[in-house]
């Protein structure tokens, strides 16, 4: 791996430096060519940084700011008050060329607003989309977008999302021809809003895409499609439903509380089934797929779950590294240019 630098909003997320610093330490231990520019409050962060190995500390540059994005105020107000905040400084570091990517667990709306404000958009993209990997029961994953950047999306935006998702899946999932689907309330041709119908008819006639039609939300984890396209409203609801169910099942197996469940587990076949089911559920553990990306920008901006723990935040950092290594913005830009030349 070539040398690369990530800008990190240390204060972002529910737990701030207590999660972000141990997570970046894991990344530094795994990637000897990696370094960080950190933005946050030195009062909270420096004691934790001093506990890291000396070699790791040498690959960290810390920029103090006591300002953070207030998650309790409206997005527009937070954007106006964002100057000097740890989140905004991290994004500005990417724009200035001090880092190749930004990772933050802060307010999603503010992060998207700042990214669209400061980071140059790709030519041919009207609005960026929030994309993430959705785990499947077979251990594979699908790319899903938009997950909340655009509450509404007309057919033109949906088609742009499809283009970006297709290129993203080719690189990240190493697929020559990803299966592409539109999220809908049914698989019948007549189902869905007008925008979905319009996008559907265009995609059906695209010989260069492996478009398979509509997919319903109950099939999201069946790995029937490699790229799932929708507006941000539907995508955000679907994603949280999937993650919530997976997390609750994992919690049930980690901490059985009902006496009949404990008695059942005490039998040999109960323990055998427990371990088999638990291993299967680990395939869809949301922590392993933490990190959503704003596709459609000239730089990599990754949003971690605010509630992420150390391991989950570590996965978000790795997600950013993987995109830099795969030159995702460059590949999306090249793919869009090639598409427009062929139209």
From Swiss-Prot:
Its EC number is 2.3.1.274. It is found in: Cytoplasm. Belongs to the PlsX family. Homodimer. Probably interacts with PlsY. It comes from Haemophilus ducreyi (strain 35000HP / ATCC 700724). One of its GO terms (biological process) is phospholipid biosynthetic process. This is Phosphate acyltransferase. Its main location: cytoplasm.
């Amino acid at each position: 791996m070539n040398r690369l630098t990530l800008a990190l909003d240390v204060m972002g997320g529910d737990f701030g430096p207590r999660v972000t610093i141990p997570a970046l330490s894991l990344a530094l231990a795994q990637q000897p060519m990696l370094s960080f520019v950190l933005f946050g409050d030195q009062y909270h962060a420096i004691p934790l940084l001093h506990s890291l190995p000396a070699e790791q500390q040498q690959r960290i540059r810390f920029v103090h700011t006591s300002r953070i994005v207030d998650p309790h105020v409206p997005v527009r107000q937070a954007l106006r008050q964002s100057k000097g905040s740890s989140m905004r400084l991290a994004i500005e570091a990417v724009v200035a060329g001090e880092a190749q990517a930004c990772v933050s667990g802060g307010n999603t709306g503010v992060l998207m607003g700042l990214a669209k404000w400061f980071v140059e958009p790709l030519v041919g993209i009207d609005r960026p989309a929030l994309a993430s990997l959705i785990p499947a029961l077979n251990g594979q994953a699908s790319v899903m977008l938009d997950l909340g950047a655009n509450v509404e999306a007309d057919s033109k935006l949906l088609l742009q999302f499809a283009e970006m998702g297709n290129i993203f899946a080719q690189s990240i999932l190493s697929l020559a021809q990803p299966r592409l689907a539109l999220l809908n309330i049914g698989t019948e041709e007549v189902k869905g809003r007008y925008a979905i119908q319009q996008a559907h008819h265009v995609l059906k006639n695209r010989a260069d895409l492996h478009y398979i039609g509509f997919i319903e939300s109950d099939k999201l984890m069946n790995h029937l499609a490699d790229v799932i396209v929708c507006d941000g409203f539907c995508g955000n609801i679907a994603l949280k439903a999937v993650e919530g169910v997976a997390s609750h099942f994992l919690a049930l197996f980690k901490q059985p509380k009902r006496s009949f469940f404990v008695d059942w587990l005490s039998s040999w076949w109960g323990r055998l089934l427990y371990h088999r089911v638990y291993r299967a559920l680990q395939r869809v553990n949301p922590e392993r797929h933490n990190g959503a990306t704003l596709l459609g920008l000239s730089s990599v901006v990754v949003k971690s779950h605010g509630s992420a723990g150390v391991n989950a935040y570590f996965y978000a950092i790795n997600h950013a590294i993987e995109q830099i290594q795969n030159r995702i913005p460059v590949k999306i830009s090249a793919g869009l240019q090639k598409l427009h030349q062929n139209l």
